[in-house]
């Protein structure tokens, strides 16, 4: 089984330094909700219907271009099984953002969301950015968790919400990019609002704005 | 969906899979650490550039970034919230979507925080203050796994480790780990050891799924060894406290550096936006300093054919702000005196470009050996940021009879790119000794800046008298000529580490009868580019005397406690040829000096290169 897993993961994280910064993202959720598939869809644009249970932890890297910056994402895929919990929670502290996933065809996985959220609160930093993702939305016929319930829970927990499908490649890219953006926002916030309002900022006409990075969404 | 796999086979595959991941992660983290080091080095340079310009001209009210003078009404500058320095409007960068701005350096600082992820570590520290900055879970896992393994190898383990052959099929990387005796402990130990790093798991740790509960724990508890967990707890604590060497092994990307003080950390840089240390008495420890030996640097020395190597280590101690060069040994040195097969080597260092005697450190002299062992640490008290502009020169010399010195070779290490955070670069290394570079400043006079002077020969009569003056009979002070010299100012002087000097000029006119007329300017405090505008007037000299005289102008940095003023550089004017070991006269200066003598009562401006 391990060899199957190994084969699924490529090994060219590469020594490429051609990026501006690195974000670490963790995907969590019950076993078999589609975390690994989701990551493979995003990183490799591939999908396998066969289920290969993830051993402990694994990761992939992907460099994206977002807001005029090259951002290297190290995306950690975790095993949902409790027996790996000690290992997986060890990775919570290093993550800037989380994708918390459930399976819209699996009630139990949805019920566990609250507990996963508690895990994040316990093991991660206070400003952890979380996106709630209801996966397998291609399986409309077998849906047991309505979009509305998903959205309500997300609101309740203060997370943003997406329904997605790793199989049909729905909202996969969007999920990651949105997560990157909210992390960027958090970053700007922590860097710039830490300073008290600047007093003597006389904005002369010669203000050197061209040095500021020219993008709309985040000041990073 | 949870599959029921037999525990034994699962453990082995799990172990392999997880270690694979840990190693892959380590590679990513190593790359990342390297990138971050590069970034921080660049920021350091930027800061240094800002700081260096302070030395160009010291001004009360100038922009901290570009040194532009700030006005009282217009362009008064404003204080940057980040660093509290006053900067001009050009040196501000406005942040997107805000009216807030930062100075160029703080802006870069912010960029670096983004790029290094330090913003995150700072935020995270609010919740986990003890968490190592770049310490990753993977590094910790590897570390704790290893610690656990070590522990098991010391204390006879229960149950005994499995046989080595179990990891036989693993990839080479895993074999490497296989040398740790505990390697074959199942991955459960890995989990257990991680568990000990964490606080008690919250209630939410309880199973959320239908997955089997702690399958890996079950057999243990049945075996009736509940103390296992605490045992491994102790193991880790002991190891940590004892600081055993395995922590230092380059296992994780960050963890090995933990024990040393990481040098290029963000906060260290930001806490010293402007260089603020000066050389102090502390710099004398651990090394011999020869004062007043500046001239020997320009003086004569022999050169042997350079052979051999020197072993030393370079470290920076953040706590004491000192650069430490640990000189260990040399081998295969050339004989200082080839015919007599004699060699009494010693090692000398400078932090170039400073070649003043205060910047010199020497080891003791070893007698009659070409394989000397020194084991001496030479120290410089210097801000880390300052080092970006410096090169470490380590040279080996033979001390012969009558203090005759023979150059045996040197190594020049540019410190700008030196990674003081890296353990590798802190360790001892052999460096091949090299001959002096062609244009080496040690064999040629050093350029220690320029001195601007204005000179005039004042004669009561016209130039005719000068031409008629008989050669060689110049002992006629009655002619009452005067040599007027205005020392205007100097620039590019070897400044102190705070970028300033308390400098003064000495003028010494040596007449043909070796009589010396000496004058001294007042001290100009806290200036890197002093403008003394001070007049030296040498009275009662005749043109013929002057043509056989020499005028030496030397610049000094006044010692704070008045012991030894530091020689900054000097220049010589005069037709007399160079004295051995003395300052040199450049041909251009010669021409200018001739002009002074041949055009009495007229001012001649000249720029003298200081050596
Ligand atoms: N129909 C459908 N199946 C999916 C989707 N994502 C994953 N799966 C399947 O669900 C099973 C578990 O997926 P996996 O990614 O291994 O789940 P993980 O345990 O959370 O990593 C596999 O058989 C996948 O093929 C999806 O979006 N749609
Ligand atoms: Mg998986
Ligand atoms: Zn400025
Ligand atoms: Zn500033």
Swiss-Prot record, chain A:
Compartment(s) where it occurs, according to its Swiss-Prot or TrEMBL record: Cytoplasm, Cytosol; Lysosome; Cytoplasmic vesicle, Secretory vesicle; Cell projection, Axon
Motif (Switch 1): 49-58
Renumbered residue ranges of the record's region Disordered: 194-220
In-chain residues carrying the UniProt-annotated modification Phosphoserine: 188, 190
PROSITE patterns to which the protein is assigned, alphabetical: RAB
Pfam family membership, one: Ras
Lipidation (S-geranylgeranyl cysteine): 218, 220
Documented EC number(s): 3.6.5.2
Modified-residue entries (Phosphothreonine), positions: 86
A Gene Ontology biological process term: regulation of synaptic vesicle fusion to presynaptic active zone membrane
Activity regulation information from UniProt: Regulated by guanine nucleotide exchange factors (GEFs) including RAB3IL1 and MADD which promote the exchange of bound GDP for free GTP. Regulated by GTPase activating proteins (GAPs) including RAB3GAP1 and TBC1D10B which increase the GTP hydrolysis activity. Inhibited by GDP dissociation inhibitors (GDIs) which prevent Rab-GDP dissociation.
Cofactor dependency: Mg(2+)
Post-translational modification: Phosphorylation of Thr-86 in the switch II region by LRRK2 prevents the association of RAB regulatory proteins, including CHM, CHML and RAB GDP dissociation inhibitors GDI1 and GDI2.
Binding site for GTP: 31-37, 48-49, 53-54, 80, 135-136, 138, 166-167
GO molecular function: GTP binding; GTPase activity; myosin V binding
SMART domains tied to this protein: RAB, RAN, RAS, RHO
Tissues of expression: Specifically expressed in brain.
This protein's domain notes: Switch 1, switch 2 and the interswitch regions are characteristic of Rab GTPases and mediate the interactions with Rab downstream effectors. The switch regions undergo conformational changes upon nucleotide binding which drives interaction with specific sets of effector proteins, with most effectors only binding to GTP-bound Rab.
Sequence similarity: Belongs to the small GTPase superfamily. Rab family.
Protein name, per record: Ras-related protein Rab-3A
Originating species: Bos taurus
Upper taxonomic lineage: Eukaryota, Metazoa, Chordata, Craniata, Vertebrata
